[in-house]
């Protein structure tokens, strides 16, 4: 159920208004926030199933004193409320312009996956467990030692 909630907040400057709007927008279920009122001291919150009590308590903690002014249910427009001008106009068929299909670019790299460590098999001769069992043979799939450039182009003098 979509609803409009009007809340009066003790806002005196623009920074307080911005903080109140930011706090209200971050709340769960809120779709839109507007500043209303003659003194710009009210905000109108539009959303779906917004917990207004928790919203007011959060505004009181983070911004300033807040009180609930009104709550109104927003009904979607009905099909019978269409403008008569739209019904009188004959439907004109426009030639459809074909848009070229947009292809998504393929990623240049594969997503990172955690490598599976390999372990030595369990000794089956029954003489105990090695002290380092199980140990990964190559946990990061690195082959050999890293190679450092011995002759860099940039020299520090």
Swiss-Prot record:
Residue ranges, compositional bias (Basic and acidic residues): 75-106
Domain HMA residue range list: 2-71
Modified residues (Cysteine methyl ester): 154
Lipoprotein as UniProt keyword: yes
Transmembrane segments: none
Keyword Zinc-finger part of the UniProt annotation: no
Entry keyword set: Lipoprotein, Metal-binding, Methylation, Prenylation
Family from the record: Belongs to the HIPP family.
Function summary: Probable heavy-metal-binding protein.
Protein's recorded name: Heavy metal-associated isoprenylated plant protein 16
């Amino acid at each position: 159920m979509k609803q409009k909630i009007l809340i009066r907040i003790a806002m005196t400057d623009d920074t307080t208004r911005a903080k109140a709007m930011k706090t209200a927008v971050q709340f769960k279920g809120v779709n839109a926030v507007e500043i209303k009122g003659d003194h710009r001291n009210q905000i109108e919150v539009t959303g779906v199933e917004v917990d207004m009590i928790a919203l007011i308590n959060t505004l009181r903690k983070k911004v300033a004193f807040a009180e609930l002014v009104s709550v109104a249910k927003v009904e979607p427009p009905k099909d019978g409320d269409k403008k008569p001008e739209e019904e009188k106009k004959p439907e004109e068929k426009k030639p459809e312009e074909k848009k070229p299909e947009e292809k998504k670019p393929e990623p240049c790299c594969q997503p990172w996956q955690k490598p599976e460590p390999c372990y030595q098999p369990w000794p089956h001769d029954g003489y105990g467990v090695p002290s380092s069992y199980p140990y990964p043979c190559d946990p990061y799939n690195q082959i050999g030692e890293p190679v450092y450039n011995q002759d860099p182009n940039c020299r520090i003098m």
